[in-house]
């Protein structure tokens, strides 16, 4: 299971128990999974790469090698956000060990035919995508084009770092106006600690 950014393996703590021990959560033993939740290179517990070239494809190759070294002949991969990109690359590389992938942020565009004669439902979806591109994706542009400018600013200001990340929790969780409706304060602070570490490495 691969996380995204801003994110960390902390995001998975509520699903690990039910997946690895379903009996303890009113499930059946046959539904149990082994879960491997690595931190992306340079995030959380993973060291910052010392060489260039650590893009999505390289991480996908390394994740497959990790699974082999851990003794898994077959596995499934799941990812969200950047984890979706890594997981998609695992599937596309088709190295033989991965039996299937699941992504919760698929990278797919609308079919050209749908754009030529969009339905009302298509228009609602396209309007939402445009709104996100215009008003919700600024963080991505900043992080992808000027990461060090942002990194120096955030590492120098704990309040700036907290505000930058908490705004994402506000926008991206179904929190009904307050992130603590979804995550308690300890969970938010633990996430903030894991998410802040890569900023210091920028």
Predicted feature residues:
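P-loop NTPase catalytic cores that bind/hydrolyze ATP
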Residues: 158-161, 187-189
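Single conserved hydrophobic/aromatic residue that forms the stacking wall/gate
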Residues: 193-202
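Amphipathic alpha-helical substructures
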Residues: 171-191
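Mature extracellular catalytic domain of secreted serine hydrolases
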Residues: 134, 149, 187, 191-193
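Catalytic cores of eukaryotic secretory-pathway lumenal/extracellular enzymes that build
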Residues: 1-2, 6-154, 160-162, 168-172
């Amino acid at each position: 299971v691969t996380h995204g950014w801003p994110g960390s393996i902390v995001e998975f703590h509520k699903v690990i128990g039910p997946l690895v021990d379903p009996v303890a959560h009113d499930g059946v033993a046959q539904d149990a999974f082994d879960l491997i939740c690595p931190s992306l290179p340079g995030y959380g517990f993973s060291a910052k790469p010392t060489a260039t070239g650590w893009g999505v494809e390289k991480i996908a190759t390394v994740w497959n090698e990790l699974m082999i070294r851990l003794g898994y002949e077959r596995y499934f991969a799941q990812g969200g956000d950047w984890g979706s990109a890594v997981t998609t690359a695992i599937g596309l590389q088709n190295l033989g060990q991965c039996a299937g992938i699941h992504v919760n942020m698929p990278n797919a565009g609308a079919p050209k035919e749908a754009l030529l004669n969009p339905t009302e439902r298509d228009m609602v979806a396209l309007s939402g995508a445009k709104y996100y591109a215009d008003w919700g994706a600024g963080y991505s542009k900043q992080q992808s084009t000027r990461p060090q400018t942002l990194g120096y600013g955030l590492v120098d200001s704990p309040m700036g770092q907290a505000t930058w990340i908490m705004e994402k929790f506000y926008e991206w969780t179904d929190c009904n106006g307050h992130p603590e409706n979804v995550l308690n304060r300890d969970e938010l602070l633990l996430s903030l600690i894991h998410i802040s570490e890569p900023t210091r490495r920028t």
